[in-house]
Amino acid sequence: MTRKNTTTNPWAKFHGPNLGYVIEQYDLYVTGAGSVDPELQELFEIFGAPSFQDDVVTGDNTATHFSPQNTGNIEKILKVVQLVEQIRSFGHTLAHINPMEDAANGQSLLEKAMSELSDADLKAIPAKTVWQDAPEGIHTALDVIHRLKDVYTKSLAYEFSHIQDSEERAWLHQMVESNSLRQPLSNKKRTALLKRLTAVEGFEQFLHKTFVGQKRFSIEGVDMLVPVLDEIVLEGAKNGVEDVMIGMAHRGRLSVLAHVLEKPYSHMFAEFKHAKIEGAVANSGWTGDVKYHLGREQVVSNEEVSTRVTLANNPSHLEFVNPVVEGFARAAQENRKKSGLPDQDTSKSFVILVHGDAAFPGQGIVSETLNLSRLNAYQTGGTIHVIANNAVGFTTDSYDSRSTKYSSDLAKGFDIPIVHVNADDPEACLAAANLAIQYRMLFKKDFLIDLIGYRRYGHNEMDDPAVTQPQVYKKIKNHPTVRAIYADQLQAAGVLNADEVETITQFTQEQLKSDYAQVPPADTSDATIHVKVPDVVAKGIQPIDTGVEIDSLRAINEGLLSWPEGFNVYPKVKKILERRKDALEENGKIEWALAESLAFASILQEGTPIRLTGQDSQRGTFAHRHIVLHDTDTNETYSPLHRLPNINASFSVHNSPLSEAAVVGYEYGYNVFAPETLVMWEAQYGDFSNTAQALFDQYVSAGRAKWGQKSGLVLLLPHGYEGQGPEHSSARPERFLQLAAENNWTVANLTSAAQYFHILRRQASILGTEAVRPLVLMTPKSLLRHPLTLSTASQLSEGRFQPALEQENLGMKPNKVKRLVLSTGKMAIDLAAEIESGKHEYNLDEVHVVRIEQLYPFPAEKVQSIIKRFKNLEEIIWVQEEPRNMGAWHYMAPILFELAGDKVKTGYIGRPDRSSPSGGDPFAHKAEQELIVAHALDVKYNFRQDKQEIEVYSN
């Protein structure tokens, strides 16, 4: 039998006849020898077997043995126990948590039990019979019911029943049922809270009246979001937290910037006015972004403590900032200045994510990110989630935007405690915030606050919400603001009088007017419309020598091939590794995986930490990497990169969950916050990377131009056409090339292990500098072990990465060369294999082949210098394995036209336009590929006469 844990044990105080009766019924329940009352049967399922404990001590401190005379019959006691548990579990259904609605109608769940118990019945039952830890002043079951209904069915409502850990559940119930959570605030704090609400409301109303019609995505209706964030931040600081990371969308963002992150009002007004103001710190890139997307970093303090708060930049793609901010936090928590895995201290930082009530259940990135919360590679010691719940998504009502009762219900599946709170009850909101931060700091797990309010205006300030929600907006129009409600409460309590409240309001208004007066007129100069990329970005990555001495490489390789005594490496893996033993000797050959490990080790020895994640990254999708070894007897793991000498930087490689978007966002965020770290994400197959397309579009490619947010993230995207069908062929390089501009990233498709070695080392060398940018690599599959991609030790020890490579033994007679073939990646190796096979009749004196290793930025000078050698060149051909509407062709075509000039033709050889990236028939694939290779190398082939679908010619 499974026993469920709970904070109330109904058997704890049963004695005499009552205990005997319950035990008798339990025996019948266990043996099945007779019928048991359904209510008792349910309690046996919940609480297990009854057991003897000490006598009850009632409110008058008199020891009491239960009997039918002083406790009522057993059935009534059990009904009370059930009622207590129902209030705890379902009290939220009765709670008044929505300021736009009357108290929730949860009568069906609780009223039946209440109707079967009179006040006299409840008064006859001692409190500790049904609530073992009843606080002082609670003497009878009637007191218990009144107290618990006051706790669970007012403006705070709780959902804890789904929490699996009994210790956590007991702590949560104890916190909310004791007096500690709702201690009255001091008059000083209540006055400060009113001042904060006055500032929030005053700021929003000032914007509303001063910048009529401009979008601001007002916080009004959930104004308490600002004090809630204040409370969480400062309570975190009291616990020693150094960094608080906040992710949120545009709703309420301007008020959070102005108040939580202390962005001066004058700077906010200048952005609305399009004016330049002295002292404003640029927090955007050269193209910039709208004001409600921008982030900020600020040290926040009070008289006692301080902490750094970071509000992440984000687009309007709702919730996609979530994993980015989690990556920030993990980077802030880890010490990467030692070998082995980094040391993580989750008390150093935590995340607050502000969600929308429609977006939280609606966007899949939310559940992807929640799934990271307990994983070793991604957990950050607990995130505090706040749903800024205004009960509408643009024009869509909640009944059209989710299939659950609450917008927060998704969180139940991740074992997250949930508090619903009425946003018109300020002190209840602060209580929820306090519970959240205490739980997070104690249990290192997520917590969710559902802050339920309303939206005073439309989705934006030019929108009329009454068109689609006429009834609710009649209510909202006449509904007082939370500031007004709280001001009335403080006046009624004698904390402030009307004049003092008015003084607070006037002070806020004067401050706003004064700050607005500091803003100069709008800047209408031409300079504001001319976008200039910083010179260091425009120049691109300058040549960097990345070779490593052979002796150092040999020492590294020796270390990579050693493991602790008694560690039993899987025999097949051991053979793979042992083949690498002589790879750096005179006649040795270095394959892709070894080149990668050598690059990693040398980068670590130079003090650069490395983090690599992906769905199979420890072994490698194609069983090539084996960077983490598993003992065949114990399943213990060992990574040689953790034990190499002369390393003072961490190395972590993790298998990720089956998610692309959240993991890419997380790694991007980690890299932004730890710019000195080589952070790499590897797709299982490049084909699957497009499920993270929003992250590539909004963050990785454009983050620096929009927000000045630098990243050196590396994307490893397995790519290559091998007859494996449309889901295992293409990383869709065309999409990355379409996004390529302003030297925003490097896109490469390499053909040798040495090139991979050098480009990784080059990327590591630019981390933390102004020259840094992401690196998008189309990585190989079949080429991982292809003999034509192997490299020698000298190719690693000398030189640097080459953006373009010429095919060896071609172009030896420059005056005879008529065709220059350009290709990249696996296509270039297929051409090389055909050339070296000798099984052809082409006149190769008339052909030269160049491999474009770096697609973007295109190595124009290098290719131009090659073209100049061939005085009789007639055509430049781009050859690719992808369909014409995919791959690099549409990116390459204008480049080739410019390179060719007026006298040289340009052309394309490859598959025709197709809707699917690849066919599914391996035999058809092979035939097509052979035809592409043959036509590319055969100068006699006349494009303009042959209309076969396999190639298209462009003049």
UniProtKB/Swiss-Prot annotation:
Enzyme Commission identifier(s): 1.2.4.2
Catalytic activity: N(6)-[(R)-lipoyl]-L-lysyl-[protein] + 2-oxoglutarate + H(+) = N(6)-[(R)-S(8)-succinyldihydrolipoyl]-L-lysyl-[protein] + CO2
A single BP term in Gene Ontology: glycolytic process
SMART domains in the cross-refs: Transket_pyr
Disulfide bonds: none
Highest taxon in the source lineage: Bacteria
A molecular function (GO) term: oxoglutarate dehydrogenase (succinyl-transferring) activity
A GO CC term assigned to this protein in UniProt: cytosol
Major enzyme class: oxidoreductase
Keyword hit for Manganese: no
InterPro entries: 2oxoglutarate_DH_E1, 2oxoglutarate_DH_E1_bac, DH_E1, KGD_C_sf, ODO-1/KGD_C, THDP-binding, Transketolase-like_Pyr-bd
Cofactors named for this entry: thiamine diphosphate
Keyword list, A-Z: Glycolysis, Oxidoreductase, Thiamine pyrophosphate
Self-association and partners: Homodimer. Part of the 2-oxoglutarate dehydrogenase (OGDH) complex composed of E1 (2-oxoglutarate dehydrogenase), E2 (dihydrolipoamide succinyltransferase) and E3 (dihydrolipoamide dehydrogenase); the complex contains multiple copies of the three enzymatic components (E1, E2 and E3).
Family, per entry: Belongs to the alpha-ketoglutarate dehydrogenase family.
Role according to the record: E1 component of the 2-oxoglutarate dehydrogenase (OGDH) complex which catalyzes the decarboxylation of 2-oxoglutarate, the first step in the conversion of 2-oxoglutarate to succinyl-CoA and CO(2).
NCBIfam families per the UniProt record, alphabetical: 2oxo_dh_E1, PRK09404.1, PRK12270.1
PANTHER family: 2-OXOADIPATE DEHYDROGENASE COMPLEX COMPONENT E1 (PTHR23152:SF4), 2-OXOGLUTARATE DEHYDROGENASE (PTHR23152)
Name of the molecule in the record: 2-oxoglutarate dehydrogenase E1 component
